[in-house]
A protein has these predicted regions:
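Bacterial N-terminal signal peptides that target proteins for export
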Residues: 1-6
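Short, aromatic-enriched amphipathic alpha-helices that serve as compact interaction elements
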Residues: 21-39
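Short, solvent-exposed secondary-structure junction/capping segments
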Residues: 35-67
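Low-complexity, intrinsically disordered terminal/linker segments enriched in charged
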Residues: 101-105, 109, 115-120, 136-162
Length: 162
């Protein structure tokens, strides 16, 4: 009986473990979390590469610091949207395409639309250990996630109200 339970547990866990090792599945999980009615922030960090996860964490700390320095009637320096999307509005449709993989790198196209406006973002993944991790997002409207984070942190927050 114990052997049967162990075999069943392996059959259940194995597909979950392999899901994180496919670039398309990683991107699908990322956008499912971003698009959720209440975005699931706990799901996202394990999908990110070490450098990107550190940059996102630093951006959040920086936002909190800016908020603490701002006057009560002043809006602090912050991103008013998901950092993973270029536009502040969430897309109405998201379709994850097939990855173009070469060695330890993979680009996955993500087609999105709001009304009649359509664009394709490209997600860069890199193998880290056994898993594929998101390293950057290049937005179809121009720019990329790493660039936005660098630009955001270049602004110097100062105490207001003298």
């Amino acid at each position: 009986m114990l052997r049967l339970a162990s075999t069943l547990a392996l059959l259940i866990v194995a597909p979950l473990a392999s899901a994180a090792s496919d670039p398309r599945d990683v991107v699908t999980l990322l956008y499912a979390a971003v698009q959720a009615p209440a975005p699931d922030e706990a799901t996202i960090p394990p999908l990110l590469g070490d450098a990107l996860r550190s940059a996102i964490d630093a951006q959040r700390v920086y936002e909190r610091t800016c908020a603490a320095l701002a006057a009560p009637d002043e809006k602090p320096h912050m991103l008013d949207q998901s950092p993973y999307l270029m536009a502040p509005d969430r897309p109405e449709t998201v379709k994850v395409g097939l990855p173009a993989t070469s060695g330890d790198g993979s680009w996955v196209p993500v087609e999105m639309a709001v009304g009649d406006y359509r664009w394709t973002d490209r997600v860069l993944l890199q193998r880290q250990g056994p898993d594929w991790k998101v390293m950057d997002i290049r937005w179809g409207q121009g720019g990329n996630l790493i660039g936005r984070l660098k630009q955001f942190s270049a602004f110097r927050c100062t105490a207001s109200g003298g």
